[in-house]
Structures are given as structure tokens and as C-alpha cells.
Amino acid sequence: MKLNFILSSLLLVLLTSCSPSETKKDNQIDPQIKKQIHILNERIIEGFVENKPEKVLTLCSDKLLGKREDIKVLMQLVSSRLKKQDFIILNEYYQKNASKKNIAVVSSGIKSQHDYQIRYESLNKEMYVVIGYFKDSADQKCFTFMYGKSGNNWKLNNLQAGILKIMNKDAIDWYQLAKSDYNKGYLIDAICKTGISTQLLKPANQLWKYRIENEILAFEQKVTKETYTRYHFPITVSEVITKPVIFRVYSQNIPEGYFPSILYTTSIDMNDIPKLSRECDKIHSKIGKLFKGITTNNKMILYRPMKSIPSGNEKAKQYGFIKKNF
């Protein structure tokens, strides 16, 4: 009798611990479950767009409520730039019994370079992950919502915010553009676009990992090393009589898009705008020779003269010039 009881208990433990795991993606998900989550998600999006924390906080789990002040700050930062109708769901996942040591993973696939995985804390037997972004923006903001089912109710367990795309291109798109520039010998453009790519690698912060993330980071190291081997900054533009000194080139965002921004020191009085403008014209006439491809590959280039290389503490006069190439 005692032996039968032990065997029955052991069988019960085995059956409980071996509950089949389940992961469904997008159209594979039960429509009823999807409908429940979409109702909650729309309320949360409304809360962010309207900057009404109570709409979001009432749907949060007890654990997430411990970060209520962080949520309020995030809402204040982004609410003025969001429109509810611009939110698009990229992917969504339903999981059941899918965690190992309270960690679960969702993956978009293993074939496309754009594929990614998200590794997150799974607090409930049933979990649901929604990844979406706001399309009408130069910097397309991404939100990742992780819901858990407690009893009969779904609650928001985690919320991550980041940037998915810049100018409708994600990290992989910018990486491909950077590789194309690199193959043409356009090192400055390659390093600028690689910089944008690496900025976009973590739309859900450290939870998100693109399938080819390591490849992108290795390329970044490669192109950075080659760029600084070829170009020894600071660079004096000796063909311009005032001898301006270029000390930094990076990609800058303006309403028209992202373009190379060239920072340089000048010997000209910073109050003499006409002379500064003429000097900039002369720099621009030589910049294509100095940096291969920069004038043929970009619609415009941004220039910022300074009296000295900034140390980070002083406040100096700064002017900017935009020179169009085509």
C-alpha cells in the first residue's frame, strides 16, 4: 500500500513537471487569447499617447507597479510624439509552460538576417509578448510588452522601450548599407552608417538580440580600425589657407534625414559669420578628395566650426552650415 502511494506520487510529480511547452506566433495564436491581449494593449497604448499613467498602471502586475515612477517618466518623454493610429504590431507570441528557471525565449526565426530573439523573465505559466512600433516617426519607437496570466486575468509584467528603425531602416538595413559603402571604399560613410546600425541593435534593451548581432559588432570593429588607420584625426585641411582642423566626423539627424556632420576648429573669429561661411565653402570643395565618396554618396553634408576642440565643460559659440551636393 505504501509502495503504491509512493509510485502514484512519483507519477504525479513526473506528469506535472513534464507538462508540454507551447509557443505560438502571430496567426498561430488562438484568436480569443489574441483578442484579450489586444484589448489590454490598446488601453496601454492610449495611456502612453494621452500621457495618462492610470490607464497603464491599472493593468500592471504587482511587481511592475514597483517601477511606477520609471513608467511615468517614460510616458512623459514619449507621449507628445506618439499617435495611437500609428502603432503597428511587428510580432506577437503566446507561450505556455515555456520557461526554464523562469526564463523564456521567443524567436522570430532563424533564416532571415532580420531575425531576432527575446530572452525574458517568465513569471507565469501562460505568457504573451507583443512587439510593436510607431511608424510615423523618423526614429520609430519600439515597445515590447510582456503579459502574464494570473488566475483568469492577464497583467503586464514587463515593458521595454527603444528604437526599432531610423528612417524606416532597422539595424540590419543600416548594416547592409554600411557594408555596401565599405566595399566601395567609402570608409567615412561606412563608419557613420555602422554607428546608426549599432544604435538600433537593442529595441528591447538587453532582452533583444539579432541573429547577426555579433557579425555587426565585428564589422564595426573592423571598419573603425581601418578608418582610423587611414585617417589620422585631427586632420588639417592644408589646401584651405586658414588651415581648419577636422577632429570628428559622425552621422547627425536633421529633419531631412541622417547626414555626415564634420566638426572642425578654425582660426577665424567666431563672430565673423561671412568669413566662416567662405571658409566652409572652401572646405566643402576639398572634402570629397579628403574623404572618398562623401560628396557623391550624400545629398548634403553638415559642418560645425569651433574655436577649439570641446573639453566637455566649456560653453562656446557654435554655428552650423549645410552644404548640398545634389
Residue ranges and their predicted role:
Residues 57-114, 198-227, 280:
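Short solvent-exposed beta->alpha transition segments
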